[in-house]
Amino acid sequence: IFYISLAYVTLKKFRLRLPEYISLLAICAFIYFVTDTKVDTLLILLLIVVSAFYNMVMKLLYRIGANTITLVAGAVVGIEIVLTYLYTANSRIFNIMDHILSGRLKYGHMAFKDYNVTMFGQFIKEYANGGIHKEKFNYFFIDVSYLRVLMFGGIVAFVALVIMLIYLVNKFIHDKTICLLLALLFAALSSLIDQHLMELSYNIIFIAMLTNNDYFKDKLV
């Protein structure tokens, strides 16, 4: 639901009307009370706030610049990967962080321990909660998108992803399409806890590398 909301808000260039704000708030309430998906609820609330103050956010991002944006985003991703690698069940601090992240540090660390990183990727057998399980199984799934690319695709694929993200940030700043930059940043933020970054059925922002994006150009700079 978050990615559908993000796609809609991006198509509207983060300029929403009152009925659209009310609809997004209703979606938040549904997600929180029916599915108990706290992260998506927070992301959609943030989407609403950014839309409400879009002009301020746009000017702020232009002022910050592409280099600072990529540096901060890269640092956050790097910290998460390092914490996952260093995770230990004997640490109270790590356990608190892992609880907040719904076990993502634990299962990510298991991936490092059992498979580690290769140059060109590898097959990793996962056991998720989807489908019908007739027998007991040991749950194991890598949720974090960046870690999935690193483990499944290898160092080469991960470096290619980093280059692509840096290119897109610079492209969106240069082309004055901040709404696309915001969509990328929201997808990147969500990918710290979900596996959908490289799935075009969820995250459509990578298509912007190959399209004419004049529709999304900012009128105020």
Where are these regions (language model features)?
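Extracytoplasmic catalytic/substrate-binding loops of multi-pass membrane glycan-assembly enzymes
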Residues: 96-109, 119-128, 137-146
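Hydrophobic transmembrane helix bundles of membrane-integrated enzymes that assemble
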Residues: 1-93, 110-116, 134-220
